[in-house]
């Protein structure tokens, strides 16, 4: 099993300001160690900490975890327990979103922690810990206290049959068969083999507005940090359960939320063998960006195939995809449009890590075809709209300069997002280094975040800034302003609680 870059980066930063020493939880009594036979059992090394998260009241959890950290509890242990507590106690039903964001946000919080200055590294994780308790309570209210059950061991297929059993179950949308099949596959196959298969199915449909592929990407990335061998089975059981949520929309070739995925599988076979050797073409990117304003999902896939077969670089296609997602947010900031960006981020990660050439082609077509679905869904919402275009937004020079200009932009952002976006363009024109802006954006999220999307969105767009060609990057960062946090208003009380808990 190869280690992804996320894992290598994580291993280089586990100290986290001197608080990440490899510590162990105190011994537990026999009564405390008794496990519910109706609930999935986790790795023995992490089970006590997960139970601590599950059983500690919300108003005491941050202080309890901080106390354990001071005694040697490691960042890696906290991250693992947080993810596992989520998948064991929060059901990805009726859709993969809402309360389930307690799971979806964990890797985003982790990425934010890696990018944070030492003194703020724990803020995203403590925010996610508190959010888990909120989701746990919602799960009790909405789903009757659902908890992940143990796998049905008698039905787990043998190693030689596990892969095909999972494929068959996913094709048939058979939840029970998929549950035992993924357990069998995880136990006997390597991480890359399992992930490669999941990339073929996680983004196949538009149900849950992209959360299925978001979960798949975040699960793979988090497992690279917390340990695949120890923790993959319960996490991937949750993932496959989420992937098969149909939201009362019967799967079928004629259902619009399924049709584009099936058509793109055939279209992917038409892409020339040398498709990755294409040349950068800014004009093609601009033309494709314009097309995304009107094209259907099926037309988007066909247009991308045409461009690739005309020797246009895949990067030029990605530029248009990122640009169109950014424009959607600019035009109508809201939950739907922000997910066009977080979904694109997740599909791009799958594309970067997939080993099968045909899967990579299909993922690129899917990234394009998701956008018209987002555009259509956004049109049904009542979010405030703006008549803006990604490629024609005019820069505005901030009145201040240097760090004071950054402060001006984020103060503006709280009142007038359009002016703030234009000032981002003006600032970057005079100061090509984006780090003062991106660092400030992260700080505001740490201090002002009130929703999982604040972390999911910011971690995605600040990462994808580097995935956009230089000529388009500044505009992409400017577009992201429409869902970033401004500096106005007080910090959340969680910031105070976290800092107080970690003192000493």
What do these predicted regions represent?
Residues 2-504:
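Mature, well-folded catalytic/scaffold domains that follow N-terminal targeting or propeptide regions
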């Amino acid at each position: 099993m190869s280690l992804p870059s996320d894992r290598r980066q994580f291993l280089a930063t586990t100290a986290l300001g001197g608080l990440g020493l490899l510590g162990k939880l105190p011994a537990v009594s026999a009564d405390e160690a008794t496990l519910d036979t109706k609930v999935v059992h986790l790795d023995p090394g992490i089970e006590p900490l997960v139970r601590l998260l599950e059983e500690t009241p919300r108003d005491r959890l941050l202080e309890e975890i901080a106390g354990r950290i001071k005694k040697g509890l490691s960042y890696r242990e906290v991250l693992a327990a947080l993810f596992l507590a989520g998948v064991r106690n929060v059901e990805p039903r009726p859709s993969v979103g809402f309360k389930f964001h307690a799971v979806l946000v964990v890797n985003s919080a982790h990425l934010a922690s890696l990018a944070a200055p030492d003194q703020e590294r724990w803020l995203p994780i403590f925010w996610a810990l508190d959010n888990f308790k909120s989701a746990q309570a919602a799960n009790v209210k909405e789903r009757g206290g659902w908890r992940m059950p143990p796998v049905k061991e008698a039905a787990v297929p043998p190693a030689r049959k596990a892969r095909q059993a999972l494929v068959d179950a996913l094709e048939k949308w058979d939840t029970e068969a998929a549950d035992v099949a993924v357990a069998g596959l995880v136990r006997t196959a390597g991480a890359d083999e399992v992930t490669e298969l999941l990339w073929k199915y996680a983004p196949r449909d538009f149900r849950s507005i992209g959360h299925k592929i978001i979960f798949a990407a975040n699960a793979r990335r988090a497992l690279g940090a917390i340990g695949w061998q120890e923790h993959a089975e319960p996490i991937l059981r949750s993932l496959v359960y989420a992937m098969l949520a149909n939201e009362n929309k019967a799967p079928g070739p004629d259902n619009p939320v399924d049709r584009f995925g099936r058509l793109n599988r055939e279209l992917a076979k038409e892409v020339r063998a040398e498709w990755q050797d294409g040349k950068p073409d800014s004009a093609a990117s601009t033309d494709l960006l314009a097309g995304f304003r009107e094209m259907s999902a099926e037309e988007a896939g066909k247009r991308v195939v045409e461009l690739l077969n005309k020797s246009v670089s895949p990067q030029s296609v990605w530029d248009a995809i990122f640009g169109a997602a950014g424009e959607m947010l600019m035009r109508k900031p809201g939950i739907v449009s922000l997910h066009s960006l977080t979904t694109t981020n997740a599909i791009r990660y799958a594309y970067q890590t997939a080993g099968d050439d045909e899967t990579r082609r299909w993922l690129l077509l899917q990234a394009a075809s998701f956008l018209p679905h987002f555009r259509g869904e956004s049109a049904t919402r009542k979010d405030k709209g703006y008549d803006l275009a990604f490629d024609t937004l005019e820069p505005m020079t901030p009145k201040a300069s240097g760090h004071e200009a950054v402060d001006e932009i984020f103060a503006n952002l709280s009142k007038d997002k359009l002016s703030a976006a234009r000032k981002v363009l003006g600032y970057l024109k005079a100061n090509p280094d984006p780090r003062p802006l991106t660092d400030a954006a992260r700080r505001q999220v740490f201090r002002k975040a009130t929703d999982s999307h604040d972390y999911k969105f910011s971690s995605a767009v600040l990462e994808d800034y580097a995935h956009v060609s230089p000529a388009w990057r500044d505009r992409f960062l400017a577009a992201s302003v429409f869902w970033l946090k401004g500096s106005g208003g007080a910090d959340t009380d969680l910031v105070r609680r976290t800092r107080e808990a970690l003192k000493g």
